[in-house]
From Swiss-Prot:
Residues 34-37 are annotated as: Interaction with substrate tRNA. Its cofactor is Mg(2+). Substrate binds at residues 11-16. It comes from the Bacteria. This is tRNA dimethylallyltransferase. ATP binds at residues 9-16. Signal peptide: none annotated. The gene is miaA.
Length: 301
């Protein structure tokens, strides 16, 4: 039976390159698990591989949402599970590539999403309108520090959703998620790229500089014409949020660059914390030869 391979780890650690290498070795197809690469036109700012960089490897779950659409982990899960099972039915190996934590978990684990209640949600949305997202996120931190650690403090939708789940279940939001010691769906093997700040931080700064040099601002300007706004899932993405703020005169371009770098580093710390808690991950050194190490772990070298 074909076994999917998941490639996880922090931003700028080389997941896409490792995914391509494994797909070549294993006759695989890539399923994207980066939430922002799901959006059409969000290319430069998400380091989405170009068609040429995909080296003839089929990719799924890229460019499937308009920037006006609200992200949905449940929708992604349904669509991506169908992709994985289709790839397996054709005798090919699904290579799941991405670092979006909840999206990875929704795919690798059989996550049954908790209930919703429109009245409870409306109450928290009213609270959000009254005190603002950062103050509401602070309340989430008091109730459930682990959930707050993986939800950005400028993300109103996920903050409200976490509070709704906590009230409805009487448990922390994290308790609604599958345990990280359960067998992964399909027996998926999870390969993680291990990095150090000393190695990764310069790569983050270099990548951010390259984004701006390659036309990131023009990309955002084009997406604004397609309906991108600051108060949306896509508009809150790291980098896009800062460019939109600079375009609106709310910060300088120098600040936009620096805040993109610091925002990415902050996100990387959350990714490290999240994936380090998952003992099913087999780690390879991102600064060495991760492909050879991964193949050895998989018993293929």
């Amino acid at each position: 039976m074909v076994t999917p391979i998941a490639v996880v780890g922090p931003t700028a650690s080389g997941k896409s390159a490792l995914g391509i290498a494994l797909a070549h070795k294993l006759d695989g197809e890539v399923v994207n698990v980066d939430s922002m690469q799901l959006y059409k036109g969000m290319d430069i700012g998400t380091a989405k591989l170009t068609v040429e960089e995909r080296e003839g490897i089929a990719h799924h779950q890229l460019d499937v949402w308009d920037v006006t659409e609200t992200a949905s982990v449940a929708r992604f899960q349904s669509d991506a599970v169908a992709d994985v099972e289709d790839i397996m039915s054709r005798g090919k190996t699904p290579i799941l590539v991405g670092g979006s934590m909840l999206y990875v978990q929704s795919l690798v684990d059989d996550w049954q999403f908790p209930p919703t209640d429109s009245a409870v949600r409306a109450r928290f949305e009213a609270r959000l309108a009254d005190i603002g997202v950062e103050a509401l996120h602070a309340e989430l931190t008091q109730l459930d520090p682990e959930a707050a650690a993986v939800i950005e403090n400028n993300d109103p939708r996920r903050t409200v959703r976490a509070l709704e789940v906590i009230e409805l279940t009487g448990q922390p939001f994290q308790a609604s998620q599958p345990p990280k010691d359960a067998p992964p769906r399909w027996g998926t093997r999870i390969i993680g790229l291990k990095t150090t700040p000393e190695w990764l931080n310069p790569r983050i700064e270099q990548r951010t500089a390259m984004m701006f040099e390659q036309g990131f601002v023009a990309e955002v300007e084009h997406l604004v014409q397609q309906g991108l706004i600051a108060d949306s899932t896509a508009g809150r993405a790291i980098g896009y949020s800062q460019v939109l703020a600079a375009m609106a005169g709310e910060m300088t371009w120098e600040d936009a660059f620096e805040r993109t770098v610091t925002g990415t580093r902050r996100y990387v710390r959350r990714q490290r914390s999240w994936f380090n808690r998952d003992h099913r991950v087999s780690w390879v050194d991102a600064s060495g030869d991760p492909t050879a190490q991964a193949l050895e772990i998989l018993g293929l070298q």
